[in-house]
Structure formats: structure tokens, C-alpha cells
Amino acid sequence: MAKLISSPSRVKAEGKLEKIIEEFIGAVNTGTQNVSIALMTSPAGWEEPGQTPEFDEYSVVIRGTLRAEGRDSVTEAGPGQAIFAARGEWVRYSTPGAEGAQYIAVCLPAFTPVTAHRDE
């Protein structure tokens, strides 16, 4: 049976500027542990600490540019493109463009602050 998720939960974001995280499916909004799906809206110049997560992360860009820095590479995606970051690999996300970015992030299993293993 299909179930309507009528609204997301706002989740506190890390980073120097405020990013809006609206989790539709995941540990916070639905108690789901195996996947999280969130709409992310970040301003120009936003960046978060690096992390070595226990989850795979798929990010589909709707607007702006999303950057993912790895140990040996930098990947940027624009509207209609996606970035995949594998679990166990260090990554740091940012939105370097003047318009910031809006994107959908899907994490398998679900994102939690504990399993993100953010840099200190």
C-alpha cells in the first residue's frame, strides 16, 4: 500500500554557512534505517567538513553546482547530473557557484550523524 509522506523534517546541517536539509524519508522523518532521501538547498560558498561515511550517497543536482572533493579528485555536477560517493571513501561537499545549489541526496543505508564520520 502506498503511503503519503506529507512533509519533510528539517535536519541540522554542518558547515560554515546554513544549508537547509529537508528529509522526506530517513531516520529522522520516518524512522527508516535502510535509506534516506532529502532535498538539500545550500547557499553560494557553503562547504561542510569532510567525512568518511558508512553509506553510499547519490546526489542529483536540480539547480546550481555541487562539488565533491575526494582524496585524489574533484567532481562537479550541474542541473540534470549526479554524483556518486561510495561508502568508506573520504568526501567533502561544497557549493562554489554564485547561485548555490539545490539537490536531492539519497543515502544507502540512511544518513545519521554518527555514521557520517565527519572530520573534526
Feature names for model-found ranges:
Residues 40, 84, 99-115:
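A short hydrophobic beta-strand segment most commonly corresponding to one strand
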Residues 30-33, 43-46, 63-66, 109-113:
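Short, charged/polar surface micro-motifs in flexible loops or helix N-caps
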Residues 72-87:
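Short acidic-glycine-tyrosine-enriched beta hairpin
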Residues 39-43, 53-70, 106:
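Short, conserved beta-strand element in jelly-roll/cupin
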Residues 48-50, 68-69, 85, 91-98:
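Short beta-strand His + acidic residue motifs that chelate non-heme Fe in jelly-roll/DSBH
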Residues 33-35, 52-53, 96-97:
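Short glycine/proline-enriched turns and hinge-like loops at secondary-structure junctions
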Residues 1-34, 41, 49, 115-120:
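A short, N-terminal "cap"/entry segment at the start of jelly-roll beta-barrel domains
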